[in-house]
């Protein structure tokens, strides 16, 4: 039990790993579609760090596209007197933003809807995007306001998911690398013109299907996502020289990333033997099997989803009457988050899953709250044992098992290292979920068979206590690696 890493073989040669997950768009609230990338990526980051690697996580924001021009033009329509829209203004731009987060969240959908029916407005938005991307100072000042207001809100909402990033970079950061990238691809004879666009072939011998060439510049001269993603890789190579890349993105993006990775290696941006892993995840669906929606049929905001779950958990723990009143709200948040994350992470990432809140928050079965309940049970036994034995509560070695349930629990605990290693090498957090559930079940069977606190043989009781203390350590570590925690009471 003294082993700091619980029997894990940490990496002999620590790697520098870039994990790209999150992928939120600036100026838009996080919705349920953002859940999986954040939750899966956070877990892979924690597992990789636990293995001893140097990990850099990057949210890679969408902060440079047409949405910026749409917001600028909608703001122009609403507040035409702002100095940003006065061509004769030469002073400093205000440090206070011209909108709050709730106003900003109203501006974007209004602009997006308007652009679908008003061609002239859309044209203005495209012009504004072009001016911003060409370095026009007034629009750059608005862009900075959009970034500051939006980032504060994004950080809060990711924080509520217990998700954090080392880098808050976006597509805008990659822009300076694009001209050099295009020039290099042309110089090496990799990029050629096709219908006015600039493309790079990515087909390889032995491909089971045909892959279309990767377009790096449109016929109108505009850069695309592929260009921006390649430029980001150049930036990452210069800043970090990564040994491994992991992208946690919707599986529908697979072709895009095959193209980007192949161009990166073909052009020598990334060494041929550097693993570039695309972890494509499936969708979270409603009970009807279709994409998860609000009652009105719209896309549900992530903060509303979390709030709904927390409220349901609050009612549940209120009924049980085991949690002190001042801990109720925080406990509901901790249990609600574990319900949500475990429901997601316990599925293989590539598979779709059905969102069923009543099943997810159950204290029985294969759920996050069930595992938390087992941890809380162990905490309670350990506290009572301390009261019972006082100064005699010494740590003793775990003894050879005397029963099948004791042996099964010991065997389960021994597997922590190999399971964690396998979760890392296969980028498969669901393996850790399965393991954690197996340990919780093994503990429960042991607990039901042995009266730990009323055991009369003091040496035997002390060995039981050592065993469940180790069980708690293993479960707590798994919870942390998956981005969850357990409450004090339930």
Annotate each PLM feature.
Residues 1-5:
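Short, basic phosphate-binding NTP loop
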Residues 6, 11-490:
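Non-catalytic interaction-recognition regions
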């Amino acid at each position: 039990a003294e082993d700091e890493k619980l029997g894990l073989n940490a990496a002999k040669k620590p790697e520098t790993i870039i994990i790209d997950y999150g992928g939120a768009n600036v100026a838009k609230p996080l919705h349920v579609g953002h859940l999986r990338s954040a939750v899966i990526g956070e877990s892979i980051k924690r597992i990789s760090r636990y293995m001893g690697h140097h990990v850099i996580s990057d949210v890679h924001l969408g902060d440079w596209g047409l949405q910026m021009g749409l917001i600028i033009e909608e703001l122009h329509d609403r507040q035409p007197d702002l100095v940003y829209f006065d061509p004769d203004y030469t002073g400093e731009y205000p440090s206070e933003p011209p909108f709050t987060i709730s106003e900003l969240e109203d501006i974007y959908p209004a602009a997006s809807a308007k652009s679908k029916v008003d061609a002239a407005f859309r044209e203005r938005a495209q012009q504004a995007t072009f001016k911003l991307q060409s370095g026009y100072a007034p629009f750059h000042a608005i862009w900075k306001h959009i970034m500051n207001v939006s980032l504060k809100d994004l950080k809060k909402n990711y924080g509520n998911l217990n998700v954090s990033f080392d880098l808050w970079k976006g597509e805008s950061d990659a822009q300076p690398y694009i001209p050099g990238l295009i020039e290099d691809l042309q110089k090496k004879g990799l990029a050629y013109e096709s219908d006015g666009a600039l493309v790079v072939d990515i087909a390889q011998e032995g491909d089971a299907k045909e892959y279309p060439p990767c377009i790096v510049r449109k016929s109108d001269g505009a850069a695309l996502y592929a260009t921006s993603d390649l430029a980001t890789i150049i930036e990452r190579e210069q800043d970090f020289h990564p040994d491994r890349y992991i992208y946690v993105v919707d599986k529908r993006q697979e072709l895009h990333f095959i193209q980007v990775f192949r161009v990166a290696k073909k052009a020598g941006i990334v060494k041929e033997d550097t693993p570039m892993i695309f972890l494509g995840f499936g969708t979270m669906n409603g009970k009807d099997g279709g994409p998860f929606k609000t009652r009105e049929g719209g896309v549900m905001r992530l903060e509303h989803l979390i709030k709904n779950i927390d409220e349901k958990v609050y009612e549940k723990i209120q009924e049980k009457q085991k949690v002190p009143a001042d801990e109720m709200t925080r406990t509901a948040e901790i249990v609600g988050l574990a319900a949500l994350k475990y429901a997601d992470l316990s599925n293989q990432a590539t598979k779709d899953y059905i969102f069923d809140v009543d099943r997810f928050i159950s204290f029985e079965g294969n759920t996050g709250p069930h595992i938390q309940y087992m941890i809380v049970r162990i905490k309670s036994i350990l506290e009572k044992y301390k009261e019972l034995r006082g100064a005699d509560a010494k740590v003793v070695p775990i003894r050879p098992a005397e029963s099948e349930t004791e042996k099964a629990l010991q065997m389960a605990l021994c597997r922590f290292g190999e399971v964690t290693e396998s979760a890392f090498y296969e980028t498969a957090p669901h393996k850790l979920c399965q393991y954690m559930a197996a340990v919780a079940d093994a503990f429960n069977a042991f607990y039901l068979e042995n009266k730990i606190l009323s055991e009369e043989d003091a040496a035997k009781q002390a060995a039981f206590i050592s065993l469940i203390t180790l069980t708690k350590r293993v479960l707590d570590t798994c919870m942390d690696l998956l981005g969850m925690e357990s409450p004090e009471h339930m």
